[in-house]
Amino acid sequence: LVINSRTLPRLPWVSLIAQKKAVILRDEQLVTSNFYDMRESGGQMQLRVNALGPGYVYLDGEAINTWEGHLPRLLFFFALDRPVVTRSEICQAFWPDLENDQAVNVFHVTKRRLHKALNFDVLVHDGGYYRVNPEVAVQHDITEFVGALVRGRMPETEDKASAWQKAIDLYRGPFLQGHSDQWIVERRAQYQQGYLEALSEMARIRLAEGRQEHALGLLLRAVGENDRYEPIHRQIMQLYADLGRRSEAAAHYQNLLDQLKQEGKTPEAETQTLYTAIIS
């Protein structure tokens, strides 16, 4: 299914692309950068935004530390999540339990604090929507991260290793680490999925080069990020077996089995079949 994103500007396209659930086309060409057509250079001000990890914002090279609480900062990250956003969507994400009038009042207070922290109106209202001020140049690590994922997936990309490695390098930690808002938790899982994909694909490349230990290190790194994604566990078990380290493959399976038992779960059938084949 191909959708013209101009008709649905309120969808979080970048996170959909990270999950391989969408692509953006322009004149039949796959878009691999600047998915929201934001100014990236030459603006009146230059913002550098790092959302992978704790979340930092830099204005003209200087870190912003005058947020007056976490809400103004998170409001800015939320505004970057999609091309445009409505006030109703903001209030629902941040203050779902407040009456509408109360939520609107808190929103305006938060927006004023955001503008005060950056010393200019970073959010502008246009046609019923809020969006990041088009006069501001924004460099966003999420855009760069997802762009690297797209290039790694493209069949025509010659140096896939560079694309996957760039995605790995840009992932400095979980999205807005330390926050537990529902929209943040959802995005965190989606971008983590892209990171696991990059690690897994990079491991495949290293295996093809005969660099098995390097590949194993990448896969173990993926498990350290998310120890519930069984396809990665199967890759690790198979690699241990290929290296002649069947006891380590069996131990890895037993660790996974113990973790799942604590949750009342069992390994996937494919994982159990692989384990049986390795120890037989």
Go through the PLM ranges and name each one.
Residues 23-33:
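Conserved AAA+ ATPase "SRH/arginine-finger" region at the nucleotide-binding site
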Residues 62-94, 111-114, 231-236:
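Short amphipathic alpha-helical recognition elements used for nucleic-acid or partner binding
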Residues 31-71, 121-131, 173:
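Short boundary/linker motifs that mark transitions into or out of structured domains
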Residues 71-76, 90, 107-120, 132, ...:
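DNA major-groove recognition helices of helix-turn-helix
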Residues 65, 80, 99-104, 127-280:
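Intrinsically disordered, charged and Pro/Gly-enriched terminal/linker segments
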Residues 1-6:
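Structural recognition of the conserved hydrophobic beta-strand(s) that form the central parallel beta-sheet
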Residues 7-23:
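Short regulatory helix/loop adjacent to the ATP-binding pocket of P-loop NTPases
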